[in-house]
Amino acid sequence: MATTAQPSDSLARRHWEWQYLELMRRIWTDGDERRDRTGVGTRSVFGAQLRFDLADGAMPLLSTKRVYWKTASREMLWFLTGSTNIRPLVLQNVKIWNEWPHARYVRETGDAIALDDFVARIAGDEAFASQWGDLGPVYGKQWVDWPTYEAAGDGLFRRGPGINQVAQVVDSLQRNPGSRRHIIEGWNVAELDTMALPPCHKTYQFHVAGNRLNGLMYQRSCDVALGLPFNLWGAALLTRMLAQQTGYEPGELVWMGGDVHLYLNHGELVEAQLSREPSGQARLNILRQPDTIFDYRIEDFEIVDYEPQGALSAPVAV
């Protein structure tokens, strides 16, 4: 089994990324090997935590492999629109959600179209995308339009106005900073079966301490090699945007995982990454303050001092 490279000096020893590498090593060497939904198999531990200080623009962007932060940012901005269709992502060359609607299309139609050809049809045919590009009421739908129902008479109910949890959190951070209810929840039990994938990063909570905004994200299921680098970035970016919108300084990001795992077919990536040492510290500049948290654009974000080591890839388990 691989062992994590050891920090060469006291400065390296304090680098936040050693937490990530140690978690990866622990899963790969000591995790429980188990069957999973995808059929690929995982090594898994239950219950993990990482902490990261967002002060001075610092961001949890891995240096031991290249993380495509613009892709992760575009996904977060897409969540905030409430969209559940992959077409806006496809048109930005964001590929991370393509496999799920493609698998559904092949399963339901029997047409064994190649993934690239399916994605090209999503991009070029709006009607096709409307029918086959939707993921069900995932993430953003729950975040900004959580469904409500109201009595319509005769024991029937009709759809009521949706709840914008993100807007509510912005308001509560400004009006009642000491509240323990600054929460964005994605786990809508009534709609899980209609989602392409139930939310993995399911719960976000925010906490004001002095003039700093802390963020916590709980992830019920975490692919540490491919998913977690994106999830850390997304949670940190959301915390940074909320801090700017509500007038606080960025505080600490706390990540908590439930079933935290590595897929058995990710061995080459794991071995390669565990042989590397973290270095440097990427920082995020937000170049303007939009009117609302829903008005950020990818051009508003600038990363400086990011010098990652080479990209590492592995197959996505669907």
PLM feature spans:
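Terminal, non-catalytic protein-protein interaction segments that mediate quaternary/complex assembly
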Residues: 2-318
